[in-house]
Regions:
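Basic/aromatic recognition patch in beta-strand/loop cores that engages polyanionic ligands
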Residues: 48, 54-58
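Conserved catalytic cores of phosphodiester-cleaving nucleases, focusing on short active-site segments
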Residues: 15, 38, 58-76, 87
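Short beta-strand or tight-loop elements
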Residues: 42, 56, 103
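A short acidic/basic microdomain associated with nuclease active sites
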Residues: 34-50
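Solvent-exposed, charged helical/coil patches
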Residues: 1-37, 105-106, 111-122
Length: 122
């Protein structure tokens, strides 16, 4: 996908060792340059029986449909994948990408489709 290609371009240009925020800013620039609609640090509200019980902040949301969670660690661990799935459960987004700007860049794609997604009752 275009997002994954852009991720690898940023990896190749910057290399390993920067803070996540540096990679996030570079990725935002490149995704915008490719004509994608992007927002960063979007608040995701978590609801329990219609009541807001907490908030998450997504690193990047692309075209209001894809949540992109960024890491700059040695490798992806299960807790990162669970975090992404929770973001998907709390939004209308069905696709999530976990991008790790580690020594060896890696990504995971997750899809979460469930009619019982945890959202505020309308």
């Amino acid at each position: 996908s275009l997002i994954i290609k852009t991720f690898y371009e940023v990896c190749n240009e910057l290399g390993y060792g920067f803070l996540k925020k540096v990679y996030q800013n570079a990725l935002l620039i490149e995704l915008k340059n490719r004509g994608l609609q992007v927002s960063s640090n979007e608040k995701i509200k978590v609801y329990y029986k219609g009541e807001n019980v907490g908030d998450y902040y997504a690193d990047i949301i692309v075209n209001n449909t894809i949540i992109v969670e960024l890491k700059a660690t040695e490798f992806i661990v299960e807790a990162f994948e669970n975090q992404l799935l929770n973001y998907l459960r709390g939004t209308d987004c069905k696709v999530g990408l976990l991008l790790n700007f580690g020594k060896k860049p890696e990504f995971k794609r997750r899809v979460f489709e469930n009619k019982r997604k945890i959202r505020k009752n309308h």
